[in-house]
Amino acid sequence: MASRKEGTGSTATSSSSTGGAVGKGKGKGGSGDSAVKQVQIDGLVVLKIIKHYQEEGQGTEVVQGVLLGLVVEDRLEITNCFPFPQHTEDDADFDEVQYQMEMMRSLRHVNIDHLHVGWYQSTYYGSFVTRALLDSQFSYQHAIEESVVLIYDPIKTAQGSLSLKAYRLTPKLMEVCKEKDFSPEALKKANITFEHMFEEVPIVIKNSHLINVLMWELEKKSAVADKHELLSLASSNHLGKNLQLLMDRVDEMSQDIIKYNTYMRNSSKQQQQKHQYQQRRQQENMQRQSRGEPPLPEEDLSKLFKPHQAPARMDSLLIAGQINTYCQNIKEFTAQNLGKLFMAQALQEYSN
């Protein structure tokens, strides 16, 4: 991975956010230094991602694209991006890999950073903790260690607060995905829970001095009355949709728990039958020995009692992580609106 010296003539503004089904990055093994400790994004990249969704995003449809940039020490600098074009099943001749190579070749010809450092995806009410995202990020991170995925929430952004978060798979989850063993025993041995699947990387949005001056001038020109709109309560549809999605995921988790409990009951019942069979064989051999007869021949118990296939638990972890994300969204929504109510009450009392 190439790197370059830090540029001058620009400033950075921090973009903080809280994670849903994620924890703070703890590096390799969950306690060491992470490969990337900070993500620095050019303001132009943020605008491109937002523009991409506004042009092609519809309802639950997500938009995706490639992130380009460089690595400077433990900081990932994202300096450019380009979208994946929307195509249907009829576009059988479309080759995504070839498209990416041609785009990066064109960027290299015009002397623009063209190193692949990750990808971005929009989300619908925070519904991004899926198996598809896990598999995609594993492929990126396995090939390029510093890769990140940016999650853009257009619904939260439309309410006046930019929602852009950077995630990476934790080292523990990377090891489990490499082994491709998602059995209950393997996940228990790796000490993997939904809180240790993703790590959130802090984001800093970088703008040039000219852009910062322009934003300062716009801030000065804005009327004081315009700022009172910040006290407007958010739509209850947002809360209702999050609750509906939360209930759907809880139903899925309930079905998954029923399947796992059925497996445990069947396994326990089979172990009892196996133990009873061994005891009967032992008693019969003792009786044959007392009569001077040879013992019964050894039998392969694995053929008589075929073990039940343990259900994969990765989907359960993803569902639990998504449930946690919805709970965090609901918590943020209610906290912000309660704060606005108290501020509006204080302003009213002050004006009276």
Swiss-Prot record:
Annotated Pfam families: eIF3h_C (PF19445), JAB (PF01398)
Keyword Phosphoprotein included in the entry's annotation: yes
SMART domains on file: JAB_MPN
Modified residues (Phosphoserine): S3, S183
Record-listed cross-link Glycyl lysine isopeptide (Lys-Gly) (interchain with G-Cter in SUMO2), residues: K303
Keywords, alphabetical: Cytoplasm, Initiation factor, Isopeptide bond, Phosphoprotein, Protein biosynthesis, Ubl conjugation
Record field: compositional bias (Low complexity): 8-19, 270-289
Compositional bias ranges of the Gly residues kind: 20-32
Chain spans, region Disordered: 1-34, 265-300
GO CC term (a single one): eukaryotic 48S preinitiation complex
Main location: cytoplasm
TM region(s), chain numbering: none
Disulphide connectivity of cysteines: none
Family classification: Belongs to the eIF-3 subunit H family.
Chain's role: Component of the eukaryotic translation initiation factor 3 (eIF-3) complex, which is required for several steps in the initiation of protein synthesis. The eIF-3 complex associates with the 40S ribosome and facilitates the recruitment of eIF-1, eIF-1A, eIF-2:GTP:methionyl-tRNAi and eIF-5 to form the 43S pre-initiation complex (43S PIC). The eIF-3 complex stimulates mRNA recruitment to the 43S PIC and scanning of the mRNA for AUG recognition.
Listed name of the protein: Eukaryotic translation initiation factor 3 subunit H
Gene name per UniProt: Eif3h
